């Protein structure tokens, strides 16, 4: 069975054609700057890369290029299902679902919770339904994995009406990634996932930590929105909620201006005054750049503090997992974080951490305590697998 996985952003469309059983990727790519004259698509297959301009620059045009490439590869008829990443499923969706008109309406109802993401996800689904009208489409939600959190973990200490009437609670994100690396960790450790307590850290431009007990999320660092939690590339992470009122009075900023700054001008970028790119910050820190050193130090401190806190949710920690662009590639972030986590019994294997090739999988801790793992995430494969489960369970021919 071949599954086409689509991730529709506000101005982009990421796609991959995968075999969920073997993990083979036959085609992948990214359409960027959709809605502008500069729209283009990058395709990769059989080790070859190609870039093309997109006339019209729409989601339909991008999917048209995907269809043409599938025809060229002789794979269009092999596609049996389409899996869609959907950022926010609210409280309604705790698992992937077959896309129906009712499901689309429910996703629309979640737009206030994810105004930047869900509208684009909906547009992508509807365009794909036009392009593949006879195939089953499955929605896989970033938030679904965290629906197993207990109420003490997901409720905010705010008026009950805010929760019951407006859905104000912690939802969490990056669920597909956290679920994938937890499963891979169980494979690497050769232990059944239901027996493991893991702390997973998805570290990229967006970053979050998750406490995974027996394969179920029991706490996570992101909340109502992806702004809560860790310091991120350009997002602030946790700040005092009173900051909005203070800046409105002292600086005359509007609510939307403050929110935009917390999302786009803060985090590593705001602290360093330089960049949101961890690679560049590490280089600058080595030359003595004060802002870069502050940003790097604060990122690691807050990450270690959050990971240590997740031990409370688990009670026992069997392992920690680093994933995402920073987690997979930054020896500095991994090493300095693990040094701070000695309180959990973790002991860094400095040689293993230094020797691990960038983007590779491996163990970077010494024996005698919880295991520290580096595992590249593969959200597209996880979406393909979950799509296959839903489609197979509905009796579609695979």
From Swiss-Prot:
Per the record, the pathway is: Metabolic intermediate biosynthesis; acetyl-CoA biosynthesis; acetyl-CoA from acetate: step 1/2
> What Gene3D superfamilies does its record include?
3.30.420.40
Q: Which PROSITE patterns match?
A: ACETATE_KINASE_1 (PS01075), ACETATE_KINASE_2 (PS01076)
Pfam families of this UniProt entry? Acetate_kinase (PF00871)
Q: Which GO terms describe its biological process?
A: acetate metabolic process; acetyl-CoA biosynthetic process
Give EC number(s), comma-separated: 2.7.2.1
The EC category is: transferase
Q: Which UniProt keywords apply?
A: ATP-binding, Cytoplasm, Kinase, Magnesium, Metal-binding, Nucleotide-binding, Transferase
Keyword Chaperone recorded:
no
Cellular component aspect of the GO annotation: cytosol
Which reaction equations make up its catalytic activity? acetate + ATP = acetyl phosphate + ADP
| Site, Transition state stabilizer: residue positions | 174, 235
Q: Which PANTHER family match?
A: ACETATE KINASE
Function summary: Catalyzes the formation of acetyl phosphate from acetate and ATP. Can also catalyze the reverse reaction.
Any idea what this protein is called? Acetate kinase
């Amino acid at each position: 069975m071949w599954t086409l996985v689509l991730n529709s952003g506000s101005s982009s469309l990421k796609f991959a054609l995968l075999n969920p059983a073997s993990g083979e990727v036959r085609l992948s790519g990214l359409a960027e700057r959709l809605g502008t004259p500069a729209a283009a698509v990058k395709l990769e297959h059989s080790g070859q890369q190609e870039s093309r301009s997109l006339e019209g620059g729409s989601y339909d045009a991008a999917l048209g290029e995907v269809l043409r490439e599938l025809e060229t590869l002789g794979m269009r008829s092999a596609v049996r299902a389409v899996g869609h990443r959907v950022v926010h499923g609210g409280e309604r969706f705790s698992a992937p679902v077959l896309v129906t008109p009712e499901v689309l309406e429910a996703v629309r109802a979640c737009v206030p919770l994810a105004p930047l993401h869900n509208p684009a996800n909906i547009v992508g689904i509807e365009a794909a339904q036009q392009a593949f009208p006879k195939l089953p489409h499955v929605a896989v939600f970033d938030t679904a994995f965290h629906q197993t959190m207990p109420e003490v973990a997901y409720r905010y200490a705010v008026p009950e009406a805010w929760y019951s009437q407006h859905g104000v609670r912690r939802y969490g994100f990056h669920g597909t990634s956290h679920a994938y690396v937890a499963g891979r960790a169980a494979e690497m450790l050769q232990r059944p996932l239901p027996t493991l307590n893991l702390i997973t850290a998805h570290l990229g431009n967006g970053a979050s930590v998750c406490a995974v007990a027996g394969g179920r999320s029991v706490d996570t660092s992101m909340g109502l929105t992806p702004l809560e939690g860790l310091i991120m590339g350009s997002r602030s992470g946790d700040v005092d909620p009173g900051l909005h009122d203070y800046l409105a009075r002292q600086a005359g900023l509007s609510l939307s201006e403050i929110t935009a700054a917390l999302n786009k001008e803060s985090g590593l970028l705001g602290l360093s005054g330089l960049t949101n790119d961890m690679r560049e910050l590490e280089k600058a820190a080595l030359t003595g750049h004060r802002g870069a050193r502050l940003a790097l130090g604060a990122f690691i401190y807050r990450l270690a503090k959050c990971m240590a806190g997740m031990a409370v949710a688990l009670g026992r920690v069997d392992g920690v997992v680093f994933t995402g662009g920073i987690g997979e590639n930054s020896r500095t972030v991994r090493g300095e974080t693990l040094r701070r986590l000695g309180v959990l019994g973790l002991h860094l294997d400095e040689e293993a951490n230094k020797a691990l090739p960038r983007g590779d999988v491996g163990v970077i801790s010494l024996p005698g305590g919880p295991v520290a793992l580096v595992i590249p995430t593969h959200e597209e494969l996880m979406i393909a697998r979950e799509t296959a489960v839903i489609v197979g369970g509905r009796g579609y021919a695979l």
